[in-house]
Structures are given as structure tokens and as C-alpha cells.
């Protein structure tokens, strides 16, 4: 007797398998890009289809690779992640944005959400939480780093300094 096939986390028993969530990673640091891609490709339901090193490349790559969720750093050469998020939102490409950054500041969170991001996490987020955040965003939800969300409530909508703006 042959054992049943292993369960796929993206399919319910007896249903048709779903296509993996197609991801783009935009970060100017090649090591970070590569590490994130390797990590996320370990997930059965996630597939990194594009990697870019600047905000200038994001919209074209999303169009070319039919991306479901774009992971964007804030500080990149050319267009930053916040400007790029607004451009993706305006282009109506059906791509959701998750900001993944070292800039864990409430003002950046506020600006990212205003630009149309569906999520905002800092780069020290545990890997399993990053993968789950991508799934939630793809399903139409929002994900915000809980510490930043709390700070935003306490400090108000725009605690960025003049230099950060």
C-alpha cells in the first residue's frame, strides 16, 4: 500500500493546488537580497521571482514577473521604498507591498501606510513571522510591527524629524 502524498500547506485535502505567492525583493544590499530570497524559497507556497537593487527597477520588474507581493527596503538608490510604494499603488498592478527595513520608526511606518503599503516590518523580524506576514498580506490583510504600531499610537501620526522628512 502506497502512503498518501505529503500535505501541501497551500491546499486543502481534495482541492486543486494553488500557485505559489510570487515575490519580488528590492534591497540595495545584495547579501540581504540573496539571504531573504534563499530563506523565502524554502517555503512551499512562496516563490521569489525577481530581485532588484534599486527603487527605479521595481515597477518594471513587477510588470514583467506578475508579482503578488513586493518586499521593499526604504533606503535604496534612485527611488526610495516609500516613493516606489506610492508608484506601485498608483499603477494598480495588483501587487501588495511589504516594507522590510532597518528604519523602525513610527514616522516611516505612517508614511509607508499612506503610500499604500500593506505591511511594515523591521529586518530583525523572525523568519517565520516574515513568511506569515507575506501570506496575510497576499490574502488581503495588513501586518504592522507591533512595537512600531504601539509607538505610533503614543507619539502621533508623524514623529519624523525634519531631516527624516
Enumerate the language-model features and the residues they cover:
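Conserved sequence signature across two-component system core domains
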Residues: 26-27, 52, 70
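Acidic catalytic/metal-coordinating carboxylates
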Residues: 53-57, 77-83
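The short loop immediately C-terminal to the conserved phospho-acceptor aspartate in CheY-like receiver
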Residues: 68-70, 74-75
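Short, conserved "switch-loop" micro-motifs in signal-transduction and mechanochemical regulators
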Residues: 103-104
Amino acid at each position: 500500500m502506497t502512503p498518501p502524498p505529503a500535505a501541501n500547506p497551500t491546499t486543502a485535502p481534495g482541492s486543486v493546488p494553488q500557485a505559489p505567492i510570487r515575490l519580488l525583493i528590492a534591497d540595495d544590499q545584495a547579501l540581504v537580497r540573496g539571504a531573504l530570497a534563499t530563506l523565502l524559497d524554502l517555503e512551499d507556497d512562496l516563490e521569489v521571482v525577481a530581485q532588484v537593487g534599486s527603487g527605479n527597477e521595481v515597477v518594471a520588474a513587477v510588470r514583467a514577473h506578475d508579482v503578488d507581493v513586493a518586499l521593499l527596503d526604504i533606503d535604496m538608490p534612485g527611488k526610495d521604498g516609500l516613493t516606489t510604494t506610492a508608484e506601485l499603488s498608483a499603477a494598480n498592478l495588483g501587487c501588495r507591498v511589504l516594507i522590510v527595513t532597518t528604519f523602525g520608526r513610527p514616522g516611516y511606518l505612517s508614511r509607508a501606510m499612506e503610500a499604500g503599503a500593506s505591511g511594515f516590518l523591521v529586518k530583525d523580524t523572525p523568519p517565520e513571522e516574515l513568511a506569515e506576514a507575506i501570506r496575510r498580506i497576499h490574502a488581503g490583510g495588513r501586518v504592522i510591527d507591533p512595537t512600531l504600531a504601539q509607538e505610533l499610537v503614543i507619539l502621533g501620526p508623524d514623529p519624523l524629524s525634519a531631516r527624516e522628512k
